[in-house]
Amino acid sequence: MEYRYETHCHSSQCSGCAKSTSQELVRAYHAAGYAGLVLTDHFIWGNTAVDKNLPWDQRMKAYYQGYLDAKVVGDELDFDVIYALEHAYGDGKEVLIYGVELDFLLANPDIPEITLDEFVDRVHAAGGIVIQAHPYRDRYYVNMAVGPRADIVDGIEVYNACNKPGEDPQALELAKTKDYIITAGGDIHKASDERIGMAGIVLPYRVHNSKEFVAAMKAKDHKFLVNGNILDTIAEADLT
């Protein structure tokens, strides 16, 4: 058996740019044949829908609510819902944080004050991994003079279904420079997006939570879903 998982998507509960709820995303991905999704809503410095004036504990619980809502539907459909987050750290650059949960966020109320390096160290200490999201995305809000943090991340998102031509090939070249974990993701923001089904990873077994997902990524047991095709290696992909 092969099980498809979305590694990068956003819900309207937590991401200001998203158009669908996490429950709607679960139903859409289930209908598209996925076994599960990883919900990676924008965190404190990103395009968040969560009130930044809330006390830290309430704010973090709000960031977790989209996941809890999605899991209710996921459990009904026997569909895996996994919590993660997308962290903007400056200059329009972002990393995907996998393997931490609400308890980690509540225990680290100084996250807004610490550097990315310190944040990554804490994620690693908690057993998580950090993936550079769309490292060469070129948009008006991204400072292209600032490169990705390839020195501290565990992996590279090589294929992003929302990227423009030319952006993913650069990510692939970066991924070749080290034994990185490589991911592919849709970066989907609405349940009606026709790109659902185009991106993700494919595993020979199911993963039910963030710890199991991280273990699978560290083991590199996954294949890649790129442009709707299942590939053994990312090098096989047409990223142009």
Feature locations, PLM:
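Charged catalytic cores and adjacent phosphate/nucleic-acid-binding surfaces used
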Residues: 1-15, 21-27, 91-104, 121, ...
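Extended substrate/RNA-proximal surfaces in nucleic-acid metabolism proteins
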Residues: 2, 43-157, 162-163, 218, ...
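Active-site flanking residues adjacent to catalytic metal/cofactor-binding acidic residues
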Residues: 7, 40, 85, 133, ...
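Ser/Thr-glycine-rich phosphate-binding loops at phosphate-binding pockets of nucleotides
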Residues: 11-12, 35-40, 44-48
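Short polybasic/polar patches that bind polyanions
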Residues: 30, 75, 176
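Non-catalytic positions within long, well-ordered alpha-helices that form the structural scaffold/packing
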Residues: 30-33, 124
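A short helix->loop->beta-strand "cap" motif at the edges of active sites that frequently abuts
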Residues: 34, 79, 178-180
